């Protein structure tokens, strides 16, 4: 088996053997990425997500350490999508081109290097997964106020074609300082909450009910102050059951995670314990939910890298596609990028192909 690049010393075949012997329930976990302030290092942990959240008023789980990321990474924003983590600036041994954009599988340690772009080198970028076309995409947004062009990198295999993108107006967010977009049961949503020490946590949630008419619904919830500490909270996302997950923005031992279900108006407190030095200090932390449940292994195979909804019958070659567009006219141009460093991403997907057997249990 082609291992591809790896950040980890554990052999790929051994990891595949371990995962193939586990049930899907055993693998479904809450992921945690913690940054050690004093050294600039990143640590990756996971803990089992409780299957029956609301049977008990209080739950305790354990977190397991998986791997450590390079301390030479930039402090720039990273992002997470369907089991992969994207770092916009990472220094890798034997790479002479300086900081590069990398997509990494934090469980196996494998990574894929994205092609360099001449334009938008200073742009902010984010990783996402398109479940319709089964593609991973990286969005690059220019920081320049005058030139607000955007680039989209699509990972996969296929022919180059074009697509039309449509923007959704969200005027309900304009007056807010901070809104986090979420996937709420298949609908686009946004949440905002106050981080004040005096008042209880007030959570506002908007859901796009009609895409064509661009109609949003809004609900406001008050989280009980005696359960949720009113210090700085981080929203991890939404589980497949519709629970909004919050955690403390700074790690502690024990580490508190909160599940709030808007439909049932229920709140669950989960206490996470870990025997690791990272949890002993006040380090930054971000968590991700439904690591396996959101990871559709069967659709993470290399797919058509172009933006075509209907794949052609021709023989396909591996590509990495750059799609550039402007907010003003929504026009799209597509540029074929060189085939460098593509085999590493295929090896990541090969590992997912084997792990998809877990869904059959």
Swiss-Prot record:
Residues 4-50 form the F-box domain. Residues 308-339 are annotated as: Disordered. Pfam families: F-box, FBA_3. It comes from the Eukaryota. SUPFAM superfamilies: F-box domain. NCBIfam families: F_box_assoc_1. This is Putative F-box protein At1g33010. It comes from Arabidopsis thaliana (Mouse-ear cress). The lineage of its organism: Eukaryota, Viridiplantae, Streptophyta, Embryophyta, Tracheophyta.
């Amino acid at each position: 088996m082609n291992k591809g690049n790896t950040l980890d010393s554990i052999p790929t075949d051994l990891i595949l053997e371990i995962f193939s012997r586990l049930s899907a329930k055993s693998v479904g976990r809450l992921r945690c990425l913690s940054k050690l302030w004093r050294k600039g290092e990143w640590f990756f942990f996971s803990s089992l997500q409780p299957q029956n959240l609301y049977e008990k008023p209080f739950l305790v789980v354990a977190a397991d350490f998986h791997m450590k990321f390079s301390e030479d990474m930039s402090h720039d924003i990273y992002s997470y999508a369907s089991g992969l983590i994207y770092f916009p600036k990472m220094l890798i041994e034997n790479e002479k081109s300086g900081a590069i954009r990398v997509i990494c599988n934090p469980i196996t340690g494998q990574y894929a290097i994205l092609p360099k772009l001449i334009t938008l080198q200073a742009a902010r970028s984010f990783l996402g997964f398109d479940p319709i076309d089964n593609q991973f995409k990286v969005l690059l947004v220019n920081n320049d106020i005058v030139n607000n062009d955007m680039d989209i990198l699509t990972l996969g295999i296929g022919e180059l074609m074009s697509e039309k993108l449509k923007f959704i107006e969200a005027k309900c967010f304009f007056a807010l300082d901070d809104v986090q977009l979420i996937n709420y049961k298949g609908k686009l949503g946004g949440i905002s909450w106050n981080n004040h020490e005096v008042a209880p946590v007030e959570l506002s949630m908007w859901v796009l009910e009609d895409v064509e008419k661009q109609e949003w619904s809004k609900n406001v919830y008050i989280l009980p102050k005696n359960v949720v500490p009113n210090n700085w909270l981080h929203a991890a996302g939404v589980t497949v059951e519709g629970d909004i997950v919050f955690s403390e923005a700074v790690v502690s031992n024990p580490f508190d995670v909160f599940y709030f279900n808007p439909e049932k108006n229920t709140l669950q407190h989960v206490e996470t314990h870990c025997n690791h030095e990272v949890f002993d200090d006040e380090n930054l932390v971000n968590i991700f939910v439904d690591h396996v449940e959101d990871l559709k292994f069967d659709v993470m195979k290399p797919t058509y890298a172009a933006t075509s909804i209907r794949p052609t019958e021709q023989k396909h070659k591996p590509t990495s596609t750059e799609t550039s567009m402007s907010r003003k006219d929504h026009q799209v141009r597509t540029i074929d990028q060189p085939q460098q460093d593509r085999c590493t991403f295929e090896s990541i997907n090969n590992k997912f192909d084997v792990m998809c057997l877990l869904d059959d249990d």
